[in-house]
Every structure is written in structure tokens, then in C-alpha cells.
Amino acid sequence: RKNKFRVRWYGNKYIIKNPILEIKKKNGWINEKILISLKPKIPLKINNKDAIIFLEKEINNKLNLNKKIIPVVSTHYLRKYFVSEKSLIRITIDRFVQSGEFFRYNFVNTNVDLNNIVLEMKYEKKYDDYVKNQLDHNYIISKNSKFINSLFYSSHKVKI
């Protein structure tokens, strides 16, 4: 089991507006998400050191863990959403994946295009066989993490 923490917001990648702390609990191929609203009084600029320190403090106060959560990388992409006719399967396609990193709370925009398109299919486990039997493709199905890919391109050497 692994827990992954991230702050998610939509719109301008440089302005953190209406951020949500997302805790993603993974157990093999099964994921669970917990969403916690963060409420800064004003939108925060990603390239403002004081704003990032403020956000870090708010997150750590809400989590109350033994370890401190710190900003490491920021991943941005253009996402399209699709839903099956009966709404049993959701598909997302992420393109133009870019990554930047935080160095001493300063955001360094690396503008790395990770040169891939990520297609994710999301559905309840009970539909697993159905989905696999319906797919007609020559692609390898694998796990993918834009976060892990971003770390690979960053200067951070973090134990994963």
C-alpha cells in the first residue's frame, strides 16, 4: 500500500486557485481518493516562495503526520474526458505533459514535454474482464505515473 499526496487545481498552471489536497491510496491496481479543500484567501502564485511555504504549512497542519510533506514537482497537462454510454467506464487522455520542480520553495519551470500521451480507463473492478475482452489493440497495458516521470526529469533524488 502506498499513499500519494498532491495538490490539484485547474486553469492557469502558474496560479493556484481553489486548490484541493488529494490523498491517493493505492493497493495494487485499486485506488482510493480522499479530497480535502484548501482555502487560501487569495489565489497563490506558483512562483512566489511565500505562497508555496504558506500552502505547505496549511497542508501539514491538515494532515498532522509524523513526516513533513514538502513540494517537489509540479506536473501540468491538457486533459480530455470521455464517458461510456452507460457511464460505467471513464476515459481520460492527457497530452502536452510538462513538468517543473521546486528548489528551496522556488518553482523552476523546466518545460519538459514528456513526449507521451497518457490514456487512462477508470471503472469498477467488477468490469475488469469485460474491458480487457473488449479491447482490440496491440499496446502494452501498464501503470503510469506522471509524478514519477516528473521526478525522473528533476534534480530531486527521492526514494520512491
Question: What does each of the following model-derived ranges do?
Answer:
Residues 1-160:
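Phosphate-end processing signature that detects enzymes handling 5′-triphosphorylated RNA
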